[in-house]
């Protein structure tokens, strides 16, 4: 019987620099999904790679004193090294500088032009270099890029345009009739309400102001727009050919089952990409999932903030599987997750060293101590055994259900619930007490057999998330990996088998203080400059009115108005270490709000967030800038701030009561 096919891809990583753990999360997430699909019996094709063209790369290479190709060769190699370090099982690592990709992009552009979907004109408007995106004046938010909040520069040049509006109605109909196409649901609502329903403008798809890119075949002074180049990797990487000579691999795997991407590029993948495919008369991918961000403790990671955590640094401290476990376990389905060194140590010690590692070590040690390593099922059972078996046999079903919905963090929680149940079983049966009673030896053997069997099932389920740990556990138990079908039965471990007589520690406990001291040496904190202290004092003059407030009555409290606001633009307040100035959409209004959160959030990461706002405060000036409200945050004992955000998707302007 032929296997069902499953094609999964990540967004290709932009080669502007070394990827941090937030970037790395996406490929680890895709790898976990791909591995589990293989466990389910699918014929899986997993593609990732690097996006290597564009003006930003050209500028970076110039700064580095190398050619663009030399620059991307180096960065792409580093990205691939980290993907391999994280033990990702991709089938294809595509580069947009691959010759076969470049040739197909030229053909695709030419085909769209011949079809009348691309036409030549003149572009005059605004361009965001970091986003490689064009905007009209009306699309800018407070004069800044609506996507990243950074300044745009005027651009005036001859260009080719794609007729986006030609396919807009067709795309809207497709989204409405394919409810799973854009996930999570909140991303779909954002695309429909903010972009498609208001109407699409034609998209500029070529540039003449830089040279690092794929030239338009019939007009080589034009360079193909980087997103048209990058998005087509999903089909060129599996052998698509414009001339009708597509490979067997393309015919086998397209359309893709899942494009896994960051939530910040959902528009390109759910509007531009589907329309490009419609132009090529190709079927659309079955699902685009915009995953949340993995944030450092004080906000989105960025080199400018100095809060970047790199995957290879984490691996050096914790090991590959511990890092994989953390990023997969700590990321909710829809909301952003947080990573800190403290949390990493806490998770390793509690979940990996204690719950999992201690369970495996205790079970093997008791098997050696009481039965010379022989694990034999004597079938001397009690009701507690049936409870254990029923619990364990339900876990694979729960994991499959969670993974089918891409709820990876929930799936890992299910696996660890199995290990926790086994630990509880040890407390319930007390093997050490049974060992003291000569008449209970067969009962003791049965208990240890049940533990080994349960661990084998749990370890096999763990393979998609922590593959090397699975292998290490099964080797020590002298056991084979179970298939999901095998996991429908309890008792497949060969009775009379012998476990290792030298159990290894899976995860050694770490001392938080020692880890933080090493991190400090790795990333020493910069001393505060005198002028920064002086500046803080100057800022204090503007906010001196903020003091501890007296008790108020309920009537006083009811005077306050709280609403949900959506930050549509944000910029740093010049000459200020603390302040950000945000443009906040509240219902049909846009308010300007100044907040002292610059040390905790960058201006870029604020854009797009839904926050809680006090909307009826009397306007006041902070650092000379008018502020028309207050964005609410929580503060811990160490002075760390966290934005107060709605738990569920709520519209801007919703009242908080």
Language model features with spans:
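N-terminal catalytic cores of NTP/NDP-binding nucleotidyl/phosphoryl-transfer enzymes
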Residues: 2-75, 94-109, 114, 131, ...
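A glycine-rich helix N-cap at a beta->alpha junction
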Residues: 76-91
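Intrinsic disorder at enzyme termini
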Residues: 470-556
């Amino acid at each position: 019987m032929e296997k069902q096919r499953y094609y999964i891809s990540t967004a290709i990583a932009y080669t502007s620099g070394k990827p941090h753990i937030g970037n790395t999360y996406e490929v680890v997430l895709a790898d976990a999904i791909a591995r589990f699909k293989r466990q389910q019996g699918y014929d899986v094709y997993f593609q990732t790679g690097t996006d290597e063209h564009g003006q930003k790369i050209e500028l970076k290479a110039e700064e580095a004193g190398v050619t663009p190709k030399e620059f991307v060769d180096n960065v792409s190699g580093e990205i691939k090294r980290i993907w391999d370090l994280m033990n990702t099982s991709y089938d294809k690592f595509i580069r947009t500088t691959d010759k076969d990709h470049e040739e197909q992009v030229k053909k695709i552009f030419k085909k769209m032009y011949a079809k009348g979907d691309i036409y030549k004109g003149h572009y005059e408007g605004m361009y965001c270099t970091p986003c490689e995106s064009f905007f009209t004046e009306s699309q800018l938010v407070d004069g800044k890029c609506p996507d990243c909040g950074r300044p745009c520069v005027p651009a005036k040049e001859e260009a080719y345009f794609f007729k986006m509006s030609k396919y807009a109605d067709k795309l809207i109909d497709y989204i409405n009739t394919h409810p799973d196409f854009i996930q999570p649901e909140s991303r779909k609502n954002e695309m429909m309400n903010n972009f498609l329903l208001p109407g699409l403008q034609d998209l500029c798809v070529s540039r003449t102001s830089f040279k690092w890119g794929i030239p338009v075949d019939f007009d080589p002074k034009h360079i193909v727009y980087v997103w048209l180049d990058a998005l087509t990797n999903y089909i060129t990487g599996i052998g698509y050919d414009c001339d009708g000579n597509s490979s067997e691999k393309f015919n086998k795997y397209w359309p893709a089952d899942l494009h896994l991407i960051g939530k910040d590029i959902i528009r390109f993948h759910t509007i531009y990409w589907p329309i490009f495919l419609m132009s090529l008369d190709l079927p659309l991918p079955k699902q685009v999932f915009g995953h949340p961000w993995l944030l450092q403790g004080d906000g989105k990671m960025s080199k400018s903030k100095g809060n970047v955590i790199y995957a290879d640094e984490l691996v050096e401290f914790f090991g590959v599987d511990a890092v994989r476990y953390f990023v997969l376990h700590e990321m909710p389905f829809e909301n952003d997750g947080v990573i800190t060194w403290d949390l990493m140590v806490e998770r390793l010690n509690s979940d990996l060293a204690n719950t999992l590692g201690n369970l495996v070590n205790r079970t093997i040690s008791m098997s050696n101590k009481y039965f010379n390593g022989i694990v034999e099922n004597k079938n001397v059972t009690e009701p507690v055994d049936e409870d254990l078996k029923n619990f364990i046999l339900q876990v694979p079903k729960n994991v499959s259900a969670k993974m089918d919905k891409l709820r990876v963090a929930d799936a890992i929680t299910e696996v660890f619930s199995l290990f926790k149940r086994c630990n509880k079983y040890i407390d319930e049966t007390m093997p050490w007490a049974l060992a003291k009673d000569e008449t209970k030896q067969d009962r003791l053997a049965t208990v240890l057999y049940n533990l080994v069997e349960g661990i084998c099932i749990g370890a096999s389920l763990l393979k998609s998330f922590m593959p090397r740990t699975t292998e290490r556990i099964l080797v020590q138990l002298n056991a084979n990996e179970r298939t999901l079908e095998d996991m429908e039965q309890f008792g497949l471990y060969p009775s009379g088998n012998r476990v290792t007589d030298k159990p290894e520690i899976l995860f050694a406990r770490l001392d938080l203080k020692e880890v933080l001291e090493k991190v400090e040496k790795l990333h020493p904190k910069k001393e505060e400059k005198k002028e920064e202290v002086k500046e803080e004092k100057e800022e204090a003059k503007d906010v001196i009115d903020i003091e501890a407030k007296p008790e108020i009555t309920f009537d006083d409290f009811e005077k306050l108005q709280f609403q949900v606001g959506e930050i549509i633009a944000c910029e740093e307040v010049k000459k200020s270490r603390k302040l950000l100035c945000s443009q906040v959409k509240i219902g049909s209004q846009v308010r300007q709000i100044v907040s002292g959160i610059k040390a905790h959030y960058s201006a870029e990461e604020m854009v797009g967030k839904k926050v809680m706002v006090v909307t009826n405060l009397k306007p006041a000036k902070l650092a000379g800038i008018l502020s028309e409200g207050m964005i609410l945050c929580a503060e811990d004992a160490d002075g760390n701030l966290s934005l107060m955000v709605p738990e569920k998707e709520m519209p801007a302007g919703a009242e908080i009561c």
